[in-house]
Amino acid sequence: QAKIAIAIDQSGSVSDEMLSAFFGELNGLAKLAEFTVVPFDTEVPEDKVYVWKKGQNKAAERVSCGGTCFNAPTEYVNKNSFDGVIILTDMEAPKPKACKAQRMWMTDQRGASNPYFKTNEKVIAID
């Protein structure tokens, strides 16, 4: 089974509505697979990282509220040998360093159509 990280942008620019939409998507994903949730703003609070077990339902939660640095979850994923990472974000931060795992992005329509940086990685827009 692939080791997947879901990095959730907790920065102040991510609205509560967007955070709720992200958790809605994750509740759907949890019907299919287990994954590791990696919350971040400018850093990853490692005591807040947890495994979301297959079949669990969770409510949206915000555990921090600073700026945004995509290098924080990228470094965490690289250090912990994940196979893939999906970053849930509003895309409002500079482009991160390279990731050893396959990386993709999930954002809203605005973030997908007007991202802060260009990437060849897959970007999925949710409503």
Per-segment meaning from a language model:
Residues Q1-D127:
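Acidic, low-complexity intrinsically disordered regions
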